[in-house]
């Protein structure tokens, strides 16, 4: 018995020795596995900090909010200060250090595979946070999203011209009314609901486009998730993985995503069966389908979340477009001398050519006025957002380390060497093809007008947005008058690079007697 007891004791001691040996090896394993990664992070940080920064000196920026608050609240000033002395600067954003390049580098980046836009939105929009999955979907399924937009959505213009108009007409009646007396409306909320309904008509068909419950879920998700992202940017990055579990906007986003899932899954299953039968019978036509079918078709068996996919396109199609429309409406109140010429151009085109996509898309003055509105107040101060996939050396020997966040400043949109009187609104600026031939159309992109991005970073949905916003503007020009409420011109809210019209702004609208009825022109 004693022998057995000693043997058990020795076995226990041996196990303890083994455990201590393993514990002793842990630091070695830690250094071996994580050491190179930690070293690379440090090396990248050293190279990044060599790039000049316009921030105030703050040696405790890791634990204080000085530089982060400066970026969020004073980004425009930082950009002016930084580019006054160089073409490459570094800003301390809320989520990372960002290398900001002068517009002169846009041509170099437009097709450079060393810079990838895939993971930038995931990092900037906190795609890893539960409830914000649509922002990660843009990263993980970027090719699928681009194909759905460029190969399907952008090719449905002929039928879309009528059904978008019908959806917009219905939404306008609900949001702005038919009263000839002035009526106060919440500008951002009204425009968002109008554009959500019209976009969903193209993306999800008539059933969901006129479903008030679904429209409410979707618009709430867009507003709540964007608000949540903006709020989380104000926090130190290391706190986000914890705080989001308790943040009200993140919690609400998760609940809305669950409601969206319950609402959309039955429609997805139905469309999936219809697609299977149509392809089996050889009767499938992409132009007769919607985004449920397009995703399923182009995914070609690849795994994806159909609900997140729908919300991804919804956010992409409506958030920045809503801001543009709010700015356009504000500009038309500030510069009312363009209203009647725009109406005259539209009425003449409709009388001569009827209600067709080609008619709506060929309105030179409207293109120019929209382009000018976007030039003076784009949705962001920088575009072509990307992540360096390798160490990159710029022409002036500046090193951008691998995994660094990179963005191109859009300050050339107000450059006096490019535009005459750059701070003045000139609605006829782009109508002259000899002055700015590369920017005649609202959808055209260039180094000096990156309202939709540039190169491979350009927004693939801008052609659909062009049609949709012009249809909405046509209805507004013919059917409504609008002016500022007592609060006056809506303020511009900034958060880092983003600059949007105050979503709480109010506007007064009233119905007018149109010179020509759009509905009478439908073919």
UniProtKB/Swiss-Prot annotation:
Q: What is its EC number?
A: 1.-.-.-
| Sugar attachment sites | 178, 281, 403
Cofactor(s) demanded: heme
> Where along the sequence do coiled-coil regions lie?
none
Q: What is this protein called?
A: Cytochrome P450 monooxygenase bsc5
Starting at the broadest rank, the lineage of the source organism is: Eukaryota, Fungi, Dikarya, Ascomycota, Pezizomycotina
Where does it localize? Membrane
Q: Where are the transmembrane segments?
A: 16-36
Its job = Cytochrome P450 monooxygenase; part of the gene cluster that mediates the biosynthesis of the diterpene glucoside brassicicene C. In the first step of the brassicicene C biosynthesis, the bifunctional diterpene synthase bsc8 that possesses both prenyl transferase and terpene cyclase activity, converts isopentenyl diphosphate and dimethylallyl diphosphate into geranylgeranyl diphosphate (GGDP) that is further converted into fusicocca-2,10(14)-diene, the first precursor for brassicicene C.
| UniProt record similarity statement | Belongs to the cytochrome P450 family.
Q: Which UniProt keywords apply?
A: Glycoprotein, Heme, Iron, Membrane, Metal-binding, Monooxygenase, Oxidoreductase, Transmembrane, Transmembrane helix
List residues binding heme.
459
* Pfam families on file: p450
Give the way it sits in the membrane: Single-pass membrane protein
Q: Which GO terms describe its cellular component?
A: membrane
Enzyme type, top EC level: oxidoreductase
Does this UniProt record's set of keywords contain Transmembrane? yes
Instruction: Name the major location.
Output: membrane
- Per UniProt, what is the name of the gene that codes for the protein in this document? bsc5
Pathway in which the depicted protein is active: Mycotoxin biosynthesis
Q: What one GO molecular function would you report for this record? A: oxidoreductase activity, acting on paired donors, with incorporation or reduction of molecular oxygen
The biological processes this protein is annotated with in GO are: secondary metabolic process
UniProt keyword Transcription present: no
């Amino acid at each position: 018995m004693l022998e057995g007891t000693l043997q058990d004791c020795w076995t226990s001691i041996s196990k303890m020795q083994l455990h201590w040996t393993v514990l002793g090896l842990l630091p070695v394993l830690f250094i071996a596995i994580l050491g190179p990664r930690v070293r690379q992070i440090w090396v990248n940080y050293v190279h990044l900090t060599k790039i000049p920064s316009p921030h105030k000196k703050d040696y405790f920026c890791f634990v204080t909010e000085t530089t982060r608050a400066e970026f969020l609240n004073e980004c425009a000033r930082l950009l002016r200060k930084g580019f006054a002395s160089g073409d490459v600067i570094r800003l301390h954003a809320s989520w990372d250090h960002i290398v900001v390049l002068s517009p002169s580098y846009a041509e170099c980046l437009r097709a450079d595979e060393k810079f990838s836009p895939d993971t930038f939105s995931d990092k900037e929009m906190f795609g890893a946070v539960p409830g914000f999955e649509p922002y990660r979907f843009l990263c993980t399924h970027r090719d699928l999203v681009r194909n759905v937009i460029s190969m399907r959505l952008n090719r449905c213009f002929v039928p879309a011209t009528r059904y978008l108009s019908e959806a917009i007409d219905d939404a306008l009646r609900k949001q702005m009314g038919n009263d000839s007396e002035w009526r106060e409306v919440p500008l951002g909320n009204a425009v968002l609901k109008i554009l959500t309904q019209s976009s969903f008509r193209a993306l999800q068909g008539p059933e969901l486009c006129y479903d008030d419950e679904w429209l409410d879920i979707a618009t709430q998700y867009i507003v709540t998730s964007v608000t949540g992202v903006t709020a989380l940017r104000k926090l130190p990055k290391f706190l986000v993985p914890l705080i989001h579990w308790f943040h009200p906007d993140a919690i609400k986003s998760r609940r809305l995503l669950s409601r969206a899932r319950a609402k959309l899954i039955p429609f997805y299953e139905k469309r999936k069966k219809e697609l299977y039968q149509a392809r089996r019978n050889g009767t499938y036509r992409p132009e007769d389908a919607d985004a449920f079918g397009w995703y399923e078709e182009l995914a070609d068996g690849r795994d994806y979340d159909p609900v997140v996919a729908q919300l991804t396109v919804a956010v992409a199609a409506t958030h920045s477009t809503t801001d543009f429309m709010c700015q356009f409406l504000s500009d038309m109140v500030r510069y009312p001398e363009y209203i009647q010429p725009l109406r005259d151009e539209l009425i003449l085109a409709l009388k001569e050519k009827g209600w067709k996509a080609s008619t709506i898309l060929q309105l030179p003055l409207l293109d120019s006025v929209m382009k000018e509105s976007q030039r003076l107040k784009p949705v962001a101060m920088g575009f072509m957002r990307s992540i360096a996939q390798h160490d990159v050396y710029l022409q002036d020997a500046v090193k951008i380390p691998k995994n660094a966040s990179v963005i191109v400043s859009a300050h050339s949109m107000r450059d006096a060497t490019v535009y005459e009187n750059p701070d003045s609104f000139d609605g006829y600026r782009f109508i002259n093809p000899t002055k700015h031939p590369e920017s005649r159309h609202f959808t055209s992109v260039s180094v000096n007008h990156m309202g939709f991005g540039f190169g491979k970073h350009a927004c693939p949905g801008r052609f659909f947005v062009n049609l949709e916003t012009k249809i909405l503007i046509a209805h507004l020009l013919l059917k409504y008058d609008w002016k500022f409420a007592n609060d006056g011109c809506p303020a511009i809210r900034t958060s880092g690079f983003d600059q949007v019209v105050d979503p709480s702004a109010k506007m007064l609208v009233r119905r007018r007697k149109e010179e020509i009825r759009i509905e009478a022109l439908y073919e």
